[in-house]
């Protein structure tokens, strides 16, 4: 076979068009500074911001993950990517100590929206928002930027402003996305043969050189001659899938006129976990899944020449199911602890008669997923506000007075369904 090699030299000429324009467009960018909206170039405080359209480029069930790397000075730590579990940590330029808190103050549409959940953890509505309903996220970092919040802003402040209506014809936007989650790297465990050899080595140190596994067992593990008596099980591979699916469908309406401006959003997010699908294992269905429904309705109404009303309503409904059927089913910690601690030769996944392997109901992690039932958690979060603004131009041009009221409601319920198996 003859090989032909060709050396190709190419020259590329790049022409870059250069034009000059007035600086007015770039200087007209507005940024929120807590109590007002100001031209970005006029702000001397340490402030950074990101638009909601930029956040929407990252398809993730948790909005907090989208903020990572997009706001200088903000550190986002991810404790878990389990569907429906919000375990992020937020730090702005390190940690503060006011009241023992480390997280920044979260302000959504002018109101502080942090609450303590049933487990005593500090939570915020930010994690339940969708990028499509966010206008901008602004990070206030230094003392001059956070001064109006006093000690509460000691750890920095995150300002989130949701989208509102515009004086324009109706715009309808529909989005549909499908994505997949995949572990960055799965741990590799010893097979039964290597495990038995190392076990013999450790056993011999404390038992005068005696061997726990004999030659017959070692040969069976090595050659795989009897998968029931001498099993070799990769519990990660047996219990988990390679990928998890994500779905998102959204519809929003935006528009208005001189009297009424509106923004309405409907959104659905679905996320399945990495656990094996239970219908593939038994006749019961308790698949791990997470569903979230978001509704937003923001309206601005000019009641009269001087009086205007601003109505904000955001609703997030969550439904989470985790197989397991016990209190440990609140999350997957128990499952991962089990599959990491089980030796590969402990027992087969199924016995010769197709019953589940294991010496007790709690031993087989795959059986627990398929047969033990499920833990279901529901939450409802309502965030609403009404703001009235009266212009007082007759007293002083540009003078106005505003009053606002906010109502937040958070509901959390759960149910536990479990059963034994043979």
Regions found by a protein language model. Give the residues of each.
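Secreted/periplasmic carbohydrate-active enzymes, especially glycoside hydrolases
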Residues: 1-2, 371, 421
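Short, small/polar-rich motifs associated with maturation and membrane association
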Residues: 1-295, 309, 357
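Transmembrane beta-barrel strand/turn architecture of Gram-negative outer membrane proteins
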Residues: 133-136, 146, 153-183, 259-348, ...
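Short glycine/proline-rich turn/loop motifs
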Residues: 229-232, 363-369
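Asp/Glu-centered strand-loop micro-motifs enriched in Gly/Pro and often flanked by an aromatic residue
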Residues: 236-241, 369-376
């Amino acid at each position: 076979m003859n090989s032909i090699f060709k050396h190709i030299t190419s020259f590329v000429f790049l022409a870059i068009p250069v034009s000059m324009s007035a600086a007015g467009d770039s200087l007209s960018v507005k940024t929120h500074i807590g109590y007002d909206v100001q031209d970005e170039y006029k702000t001397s405080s340490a402030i950074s911001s990101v638009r909601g359209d930029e956040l929407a480029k990252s398809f993730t069930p948790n909005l907090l993950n989208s903020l990572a790397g997009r706001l200088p000075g903000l550190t986002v730590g991810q404790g878990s990517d389990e569907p429906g579990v919000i375990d992020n940590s937020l730090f702005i330029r390190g940690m503060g100590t006011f009241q023992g808190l480390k997280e920044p103050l979260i302000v959504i549409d002018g109101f502080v929206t942090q609450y303590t959940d049933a487990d005593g953890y500090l939570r915020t509505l930010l994690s339940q928002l969708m990028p499509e309903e966010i206008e901008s996220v602004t990070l206030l970092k230094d003392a001059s930027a956070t001064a109006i919040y006093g000690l509460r802003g000691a750890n920095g402040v995150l300002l989130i402003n949701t989208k509102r209506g515009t004086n324009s014809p109706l715009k309808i936007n529909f989005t549909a996305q499908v994505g997949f989650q995949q572990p960055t790297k799965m741990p590799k465990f010893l097979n039964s043969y290597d495990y038995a050899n190392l076990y013999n080595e450790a056993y011999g140190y404390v038992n005068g050189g005696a061997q726990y596994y004999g030659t017959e067992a070692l040969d069976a593990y090595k050659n795989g001659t009897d998968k029931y008596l001498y099993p070799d099980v990769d519990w990660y591979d047996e219990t988990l899938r390679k990928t998890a699916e994500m779905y998102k469908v959204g519809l929003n309406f935006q528009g208005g006129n001189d009297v009424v401006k509106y923004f309405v959003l409907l959104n659905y997010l679905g996320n399945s976990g990495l656990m094996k699908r239970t219908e593939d294992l038994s006749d019961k269905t308790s698949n791990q899944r997470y569903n979230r429904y978001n509704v937003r309705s923001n309206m601005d109404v000019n009641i009269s020449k001087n009086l205007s009303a601003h109505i904000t309503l955001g609703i997030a409904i969550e439904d989470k199911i985790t197989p397991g059927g016990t209190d440990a089913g609140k999350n997957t910690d128990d499952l991962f602890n089990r599959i990491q601690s089980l030796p590969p030769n402990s027992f087969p996944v199924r016995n010769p008669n197709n019953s589940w392997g294991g010496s007790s109901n709690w031993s087989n992690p795959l059986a627990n997923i398929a047969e033990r039932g499920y833990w279901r958690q529901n939450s409802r979060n309502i965030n609403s506000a009404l703001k009235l603004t009266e212009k007082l131009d007759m007293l002083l041009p540009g003078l106005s007075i505003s009053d606002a009221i906010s109502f937040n409601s958070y509901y959390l319920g759960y149910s536990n369904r479990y059963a034994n198996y043979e």
